[in-house]
């Protein structure tokens, strides 16, 4: 069975708006969504959703219905994707990523780690998060900044993916870290990556949808919560996330497009958190808030 990409071609601004629509209608599904720049000079972008061939008819119908009010002029195009390990392929030849004191590298680049750097080795796998995306790098840089300015006794990495942020938090802070994900594959991959990086104690991994698990009350409240997911779920879970934050604690949020920043800030200001800092990387933002 092949993988299909359904997409619309438009401007950067409209692609971001279409991505918001996709996030809303596919929030409870496991479909990957993304925007991609096609032509910088002509401001041509694509907003895409990925699925298997047997799901195409249903996804197309839902997408067309959601787009017909504001974006009916944008045709939904289709591409059949070849059977390629895109994660592995995309990492071929990628240089190590440096963010603050952290360097994220593949096993083929161990010799490029410099003295004094905090090295985290992440190879291509089934879970998201290699450090090459602006949101992951932004979280790493913000983590280093928070560690310099505020005491942290424990931390939560919500939506851990490959585990890179949880591993980074433990290596930098040396405090108990809980790492959760809704995907059991991600949880397993993250635990494997932690062991590969020599982190065998101090990190707890759990498969948990949102905050509907006793693992949060058992391990929390948390001095630091890192959530690198998407803007819409971040806004939706703001009350539950803040309920698990310790007094005086910090929150690092990412997976947020620059134009979505104000909506996310409004959701967390409504929970009495204060904006401390925003980092900008390649159209994405990472936000630090405090209690």
Curated annotation (Swiss-Prot):
UniProt main location, coarse: cytoplasm
Alphabetical list of InterPro entries matching this protein: Ribosomal_L11_MeTrfase_PrmA (IPR050078), Ribosomal_PrmA_MeTrfase (IPR004498), SAM-dependent_MTases_sf (IPR029063)
Catalytic activity, as annotated: L-lysyl-[protein] + 3 S-adenosyl-L-methionine = N(6),N(6),N(6)-trimethyl-L-lysyl-[protein] + 3 S-adenosyl-L-homocysteine + 3 H(+)
Annotated GO biological process: methylation
Broadest EC class assigned to this enzyme: transferase
Pfam families (UniProt xref): PrmA (PF06325)
Annotated S-adenosyl-L-methionine binding sites: 136, 159, 181, 228
Gene Ontology annotations for the cellular component aspect, listed alphabetically: cytoplasm
Family per similarity comment: Belongs to the methyltransferase superfamily. PrmA family.
Functional summary from the UniProt entry: Methylates ribosomal protein L11.
Record's protein name: Ribosomal protein L11 methyltransferase
Gene label: prmA
């Amino acid at each position: 069975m092949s993988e299909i990409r359904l997409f619309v071609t438009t401007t950067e601004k409209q692609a971001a708006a279409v991505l918001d629509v996709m996030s809303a209608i596919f929030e409870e599904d496991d479909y990957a969504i993304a925007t991609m720049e096609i032509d910088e000079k002509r401001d041509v972008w694509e907003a895409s959703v990925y699925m298997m061939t047997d799901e195409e008819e249903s996804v197309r119908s839902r997408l067309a219905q959601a787009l017909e009010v504001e974006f009916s002029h944008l045709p939904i195009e289709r591409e059949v994707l070849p059977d390629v390990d895109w994660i592995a392929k995309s990492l071929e030849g990628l240089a190590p990523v440096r963010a603050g004191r952290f360097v994220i590298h593949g096993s083929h680049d161990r010799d490029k780690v410099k003295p004094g750097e905090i090295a985290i080795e992440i190879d291509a796998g089934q879970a998201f998060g290699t450090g090459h995306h602006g949101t992951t790098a932004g979280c790493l840089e913000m983590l280093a900044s928070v560690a310099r300015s505020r005491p942290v006794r424990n931390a939560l990495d919500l939506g851990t993916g490959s585990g890179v942020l949880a591993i980074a938090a433990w290596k930098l802070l040396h405090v108990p870290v809980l790492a959760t994900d809704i995907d059991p594959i991600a949880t397993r991959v993250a635990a494997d990556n932690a062991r590969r990086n020599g982190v065998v104690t101090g990190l707890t991994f759990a498969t948990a949808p949102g905050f509907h698990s006793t693992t949060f009350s058992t391990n929390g409240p948390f001095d630091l919560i890192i959530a690198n997911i998407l803007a819409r779920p971040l806004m939706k879970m703001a009350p539950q996330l803040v309920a698990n934050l310790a007094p005086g604690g910090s929150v690092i949020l990412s997976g947020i497009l620059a134009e979505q920043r104000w909506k996310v800030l409004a959701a967390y200001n409504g929970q009495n958190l204060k904006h401390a800092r925003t980092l900008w990387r390649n159209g994405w933002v990472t936000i630090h808030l405090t209690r």
